């Protein structure tokens, strides 16, 4: 963490020395993160020294293959899995789509193979594969599922989250299971509220249910979690989570914009089918010549998380908590913390809040800010205009409060000095807006 400490000091020094009109403070780390210097170095070295095709036997190719293998090992270590269960993808969207498409294809394949039941009724005969998710998922889960439903390729149940704690309840997931259910996909942590979902409990309940289903001739239910927002901010271990699939997104933990997918017992215990066809790379599950420099960067980012994760988490939690203290001190009862729910844990870096007032819509406040760089919510929902976030509404946040929402997410180099600048910037932005009324 010495390098991180140096970066913190550098950031603090910049914040203190820069003239007020030129100071910019980035607090949108849930949207994306900058590359760590070590990541840039790993990528640059790969471009310079490992330019060969990883499938080739000459030195530059062997070097590329070695880098890819090391990166796979680092990713596995970060999540407590096995290297052979990790494949590289272009990013979280591809990983999520790959899971969904694979499970649907597997359902049809197994159902066709088991079509002849010797005159006995097949409990899923004629049924479409059924997938369960929740109402606050990322678009890379929600939209593929809506598309499958519109095309009548699958049936989908969107389970609402609790308006008390912002979580999806395991009991509600189990209640939605049907004979043709083949997948439950629930994000590990929400990108807008930071609320951590009870994925371990859901996995445990589904495993117990699967024992009964198999005995009754029903297909087993697989469990997937999109861990994009959790990785690099809290401990993530697939053994504790008990999932069959886990999505990894590099640019959320200071890595490059590629991703990976963990598949428990890839190809043996858990099915996976390629969406692309070509060469034999990634054991035919994801063909195409590997992007060695990006993979090198992803592996280095994972290595840093495995080595420094606890320190990263503690630092971000301290800065985030200080941010919420300062907001409360400055705005008093006008502040509504949209990401604090009783009985629910949340990411250590995320603060979603609203400043009450008829002129203080989140976008309007941010537009008046001269220092703060942030967003009102998920980057993929940037086209909502002044409409309140569907995620916050699903969590029970009132419409007038949700419309004023701002999401601040701190990072590894965020400082208390930057928090002070941001709160002062928000105070001045609010004063300007209310002065215009």
Swiss-Prot record:
Cellular component GO terms held in the UniProt record: cytosol
Region Disordered: list its residue ranges: 1-30
Query: Which keywords describe this protein according to UniProt?
Result: Acetylation, Cytoplasm, Lyase, Pyridoxal phosphate, Transferase
Record-level Gene Ontology MF annotations:
selenocysteine lyase activity; transferase activity
| E.C. numbers | 4.4.1.16
Positions with biased composition (Basic and acidic residues)? 7-26
Residues with N-acetylmethionine modification: 1
Q: Which residues carry this modification: N6-(pyridoxal phosphate)lysine?
A: 252
Q: Name one Pfam family in it.
A: Aminotran_5
Report what the protein is called. Answer: Selenocysteine lyase
Supply the source organism for this entry.
Bos taurus (Bovine)
Q: What is the lineage of its organism?
A: Eukaryota, Metazoa, Chordata, Craniata, Vertebrata
UniProt lists the gene as SCLY
